[in-house]
């Protein structure tokens, strides 16, 4: 026994300071272990106290357990049947306490006085429309007084966002905000650009028309007039025509430069000139339309006249009178060709 006691004293469980375990750590439950008391003295003795096995006393028997029906125990079946069969008519104020005004419209119960009863059992009528009774209309009555604050938020309409339109808004004070001023400036710039583009197009069209007119004027100035430009060439052609007429008539007569032929050429000259002068006015319009072709004809006519004038021969001296008179007529005839 003394050796066991020594072992118990040296064990870490028995010594509070020895061993690696802290005394704060909870130890295992020793309810099932053997309980002993040691008396120290001259003769130390170990006294066994308590039972060998730790056994708890069973709980006392309860009156109400889970196998019993509480409704029968307390007698609540009768009250349950009454609660099921009874129809409660609770007032409106019992579950809607925050609504202002008189909530209970009718204190005494009246049949067909609720809106539900009218919906479930509508009044039977014929084709005619019968008005509801005042008792039935009581279900549709609105209570006087303002709407409570807790329900006002549901009926508040959200503020509509103002869309910025590109229109000039006139203010009474004449003061425009920054956003409106920027909108006005942008709109003004757009209109100015559109007007500027239209103005440019108009100016371009005017310039094109002016250029066309100037080109036409230059062409008219460069081309010589029919009466003035044909005189030098016409004179040469007239002389050549006179030479040609004299030589041809002289050859037909059989002698160069005879007196009868010269008088014949002189008599033919004024008549041809008169006829050609009357015809020249109608031909001037055609000459203006065919200016480039006339210039080519004039150059070729002048060349022909110069050739004929130089190579006339003896016929030119014999037909002098006819050549003088037929100069203008020859020029007009050559202009036609």
UniProtKB/Swiss-Prot annotation:
Basic residues composition-biased segments: 159-171, 208-221
Composition bias, Low complexity: 297-309
Compositionally biased spans, kind Polar residues: 28-38
InterPro entries in the record: Mediator_Med19_met
Main location: nucleus
Region (Disordered): 1-38, 155-234, 297-337
Coiled coil: 189-223
Membrane-spanning residues: none
MF (Gene Ontology): DNA-binding transcription factor binding; transcription coregulator activity
GO terms (BP aspect): positive regulation of transcription by RNA polymerase II; regulation of transcription by RNA polymerase II
Top-level taxon of origin: Eukaryota
Pfam families xrefs: Med19 (PF10278)
Stretches with biased composition (Gly residues): 310-330
Subcellular location: Nucleus
GO cellular component annotations of the record: mediator complex
Keywords: Activator, Coiled coil, Nucleus, Transcription, Transcription regulation
Oligomeric form and interacting partners: Component of the Mediator complex.
Function description: Component of the Mediator complex, a coactivator involved in the regulated transcription of nearly all RNA polymerase II-dependent genes. Mediator functions as a bridge to convey information from gene-specific regulatory proteins to the basal RNA polymerase II transcription machinery. Mediator is recruited to promoters by direct interactions with regulatory proteins and serves as a scaffold for the assembly of a functional preinitiation complex with RNA polymerase II and the general transcription factors.
Recorded family membership: Belongs to the Mediator complex subunit 19 family.
Protein name: Mediator of RNA polymerase II transcription subunit 19
Organism: Drosophila melanogaster (Fruit fly)
Gene assigned in the entry: MED19
């Amino acid at each position: 026994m003394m050796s066991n006691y020594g072992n118990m004293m040296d064990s870490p469980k028995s010594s509070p300071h020895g061993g690696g375990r802290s005394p704060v750590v909870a130890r295992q439950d020793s309810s099932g272990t053997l309980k002993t008391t040691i008396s120290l003295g001259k003769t130390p003795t170990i006294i066994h106290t308590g039972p060998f096995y730790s056994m708890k006393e069973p709980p006392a028997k309860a009156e109400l357990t889970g196998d019993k029906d509480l409704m029968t125990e307390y007698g609540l079946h009768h009250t349950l049947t009454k609660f099921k069969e009874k129809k409660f008519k609770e007032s409106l104020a019992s579950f809607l306490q925050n609504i202002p005004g008189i909530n209970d419209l009718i204190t005494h119960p009246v049949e067909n006085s609720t809106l539900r009863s009218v919906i479930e059992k509508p009044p039977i009528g014929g084709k005619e429309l019968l008005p509801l009774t005042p008792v039935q209309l009581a279900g549709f009555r609105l209570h006087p007084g303002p709407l409570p604050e807790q329900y006002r938020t549901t009926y508040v309409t959200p503020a509509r966002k103002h869309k910025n339109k590109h229109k000039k808004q006139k203010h009474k004070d004449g003061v425009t905000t920054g956003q409106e001023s920027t909108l006005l400036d942008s709109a003004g710039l757009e209109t100015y650009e559109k007007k500027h583009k239209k103005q440019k197009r108009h100016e371009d069209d005017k310039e094109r028309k002016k250029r066309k007119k100037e080109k036409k004027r230059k062409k008219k100035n460069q081309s010589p007039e029919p009466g003035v430009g044909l005189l030098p060439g016409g004179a040469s052609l007239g002389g050549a025509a006179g030479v040609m007429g004299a030589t041809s008539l002289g050859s037909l007569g059989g002698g160069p430069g005879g007196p009868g032929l010269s008088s014949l050429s002189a008599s033919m000259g004024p008549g041809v000139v008169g006829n050609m002068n009357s015809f020249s006015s109608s031909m001037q319009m055609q000459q203006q339309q065919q200016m480039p072709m006339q210039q080519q004809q004039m150059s070729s006519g002048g060349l022909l006249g110069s050739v004929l004038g130089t190579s006339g021969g003896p016929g030119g001296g014999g037909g002098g009178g006819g050549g003088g008179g037929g100069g203008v007529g020859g020029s007009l005839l050559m202009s036609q060709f």
